[in-house]
Amino acid sequence: MQALVNKIWYQGHPLRWLLLPLSWLFAVITYVRRALFRLGIKSQTAMPVPVIVVGNITVGGSGKTPTVIYLIELLRQHGFTPGVISRGYGVDIQGVKTVNLGASAAEVGDEPAMIVARTQVPMVVGAKRVDAANALIAEFGVDVIICDDGLQHYALGRDIELVVIDGQRGLGNGLLLPAGPLREGAWRLDAVDFIVNNGGPAAKGQFEMQLAPTEVKPVKCDVTSGEYSFDKSQPLVAMAGIGNPARFFESLRAQGYQLALCQGFDDHQAYDKTLLRDLAQDLPLLMTEKDAVKCRDFAQENWWYLAVNAKLSPQFDEQLLARLREVAAAKQGNFHGIR
C-alpha cells in the first residue's frame, strides 16, 4: 500500500486525479479550521515562555527530529533551558506523561524516547499540546518550549514556526491529502518564520540542512564503548522505519557500506525479535537511531545503528537566536494571534 501511495504522491501516478475531489474537501476543512483560530472563534492558548514549533506541511518524515535535537543543543549553548513537547505518535497516552531517561518507545513513542536518550532534555508527551506545555513548565521550569511536530495544532500558541522540508522529495505532486502528501497548501510556507531544507539545495529564503553521520554503535545496551568494532566493508542488511527509508540507504552506499539487502518499513513501525532475526539471516543488521530505541530490549550482538547530526549555517543560528531573544524580552503571556 505504501508503495502505491508513494507512486501517487511522488511519481505522477494517474490515480491522483480520482482522489482530487477528496483533496478539495480536505482543503476546505483545513482552511475553515485555521480561519476559526485566526478569527478567535476557536481559542488559542499562549504560553508564558517562547514556543518554537518544528513541523512540516507534508505527511511523513522530513528531518524534524534531528532539527529538534539541533535546537536543543543550540539553545543550551546560548544560556537557555529548553524543554520539548510531543504527541507521542502511535501511543495511547491518557493526559500527559513525562518522558524519563530509559523510557521505552512503547510507552512514550519512538521519537520522544530517542530525543531524551540523546539529549536528556525535559520532555512531556500528550495528545493535547497545551496540557503538555503547561506540565512541562510546572515540572521543569523551562524558559523555551520546542514543540516537536505541531504546526497544525493551532490550539497551542506559538511564537516561532519552523518548517522542515525534505530536499529530495520536496512537496511531491503539490496536492493535498489524499491525492498528495500535503497537510496544508504550499501557501502556508509564506506564513512561517524559518524554512529548513533537509538535503537541499535550499531555495531563496530557506536554510540548507545536512545530516552528518556519526559512528556506528551497537543497539544492545550492555555493549560498552571500546568493546566493539564495526567493519563497514562486510556485507550487511540495512533497515529503516522512517518517512523516507531510501534516503538512509543512499547515505549508507555513499559512505561505502556494503548493503546485501535494504528493507524499508513504515514510519513508526513496531518490531519484534523474530521479524528482524529472520530479516538479518545472521548478517550484521544496521538501522537508524529511531529504530534502535525500539529494538534495545531484544537486540543481538551484531545489530547496529547509525546516528546523524543536523548541520545548519551560522546565519540560521544567528537569526533564530535573535528572533528568540526578541520574543523572550517581549513575552508577557498575552494572546499571540495566529499568523
From Swiss-Prot:
The pathway entry for this protein reads as:
Glycolipid biosynthesis; lipid IV(A) biosynthesis; lipid IV(A) from (3R)-3-hydroxytetradecanoyl-[acyl-carrier-protein] and UDP-N-acetyl-alpha-D-glucosamine: step 6/6
- Which SUPFAM superfamilies does this chain map to? P-loop containing nucleoside triphosphate hydrolases (SSF52540)
What protein name applies here? Answer: Tetraacyldisaccharide 4'-kinase
- Please give the function described in this protein's UniProt entry: Transfers the gamma-phosphate of ATP to the 4'-position of a tetraacyldisaccharide 1-phosphate intermediate (termed DS-1-P) to form tetraacyldisaccharide 1,4'-bis-phosphate (lipid IVA).
Matching InterPro entries, A to Z? LpxK, P-loop_NTPase
Any coiled-coil regions, as ranges: none
Annotated signal sequence is none
Q: Which GO terms describe its molecular function?
A: ATP binding; tetraacyldisaccharide 4'-kinase activity
| HAMAP family linked | LpxK
- Pfam families with a match to the protein in the record: LpxK
Species of origin reads Shewanella baltica (strain OS155 / ATCC BAA-1091)
Where does this protein hold ATP? 58-65
Q: Which NCBIfam families match?
A: lpxK
Q: Which reaction does it catalyse?
A: a lipid A disaccharide + ATP = a lipid IVA + ADP + H(+)
Could you say which enzyme class this protein belongs to? Answer: transferase
Cellular component, GO annotation? plasma membrane
- Name the Enzyme Commission number(s) assigned to this protein: 2.7.1.130
| Alphabetical UniProt keywords | ATP-binding, Kinase, Lipid A biosynthesis, Lipid biosynthesis, Lipid metabolism, Nucleotide-binding, Transferase
Q: Which family does it belong to?
A: Belongs to the LpxK family.
**From its record, what is one biological process in GO terms?**
lipopolysaccharide core region biosynthetic process
